[in-house]
Amino acid sequence: MKTFEGKVVVITGAGSGLGRAYAREFANRGAVLALNDYDSSSLRDTCALMPPRTKTFSSAFDVSDRDAMYRFADDVAAAVGPAHVVINNAGIAGVGAPAWALADKDFERLMAVDFFSVVHGTRAFLPHLRENADGAIVNISSLFGLTGAPNKSDYCAAKFAVRGFTEALMVEMTREPVSVHLVHPGGTATNISNNTGDTGFSDHFLRTDPADVAVGTAEAILKGRPRLVVAHAAFKTQVASSFLPRRLMNRILWHQLAPVIDTSQYPGTAARRAPRSTWPFH
């Protein structure tokens, strides 16, 4: 793909944060937008922020609803034409508690939104991308699709699943004219990230402007880069998780994160808590 001018770009979770930043970035590059969000009011706000010349189609629904996603793909094709780029961005952050304290329904809900919506979005739009013979699938993982973290077992599970699904898809699509991209944002300041019980974590780590991630993603598509690790702490974490012994990495993660998360449900936490390290996340 050489340009986004006139291309149909589908973005889920476009009502705020990174999804809204994607909408702005691709609108500024001349794309036709097909936007989704669960919150119809936020979705309307995003549409209103687009340049007047931008052709926009929008649909509010829950991305974990498989049938709704397939209807969306057909509705997009009917309204603005078959998709050229699909960005499976929608997600929720979870409740911010250790694995043993999570309710089954909360774990299942997060997996439905953060992982299975990516599967549904990819499979629903793939026939349309093939029809154009010039397309891109962009699946959003996370810093926590590179390493585990306390109070993030549900979120990490979903984002690692996105990573595995997308890496397999890259191999499967090798001989096709549709490129596949995996994005690992880290420390991105969005409403989704802020809506957890760990406000200290949000205040301390969520420093990156979503617009920077959106620019990096657009350039990755144009340059054919399959993986993008971008934003605060993501690259350092990728390197550390690849080369450090797991036990050392676990200690670093705990020392770094324990002071800024809710540790009230950890037995003996106060006695075990160590001074916070400033690496690899700074």
Task: Give the residues covered by each predicted segment.
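Active-site helix of classical SDR
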Residues: 122, 158
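Conserved glycine-rich Rossmann-like NAD(P)H-binding loop of the short-chain dehydrogenase/reductase
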Residues: 29-45
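Residue(s) in the substrate-gating loop at a strand-loop-helix junction
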Residues: 142
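Conserved glycine-rich cofactor-binding loop
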Residues: 8, 15-16
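C-terminal helical subdomain
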Residues: 182, 202-237
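The beta1-alpha1 cofactor-binding region of Rossmann-like NAD(H)/NADP(H)-dependent oxidoreductases
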Residues: 40-41, 60-71, 104
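Substrate-binding pocket helix/loop in short-chain dehydrogenase/reductase
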Residues: 97-99, 103-108
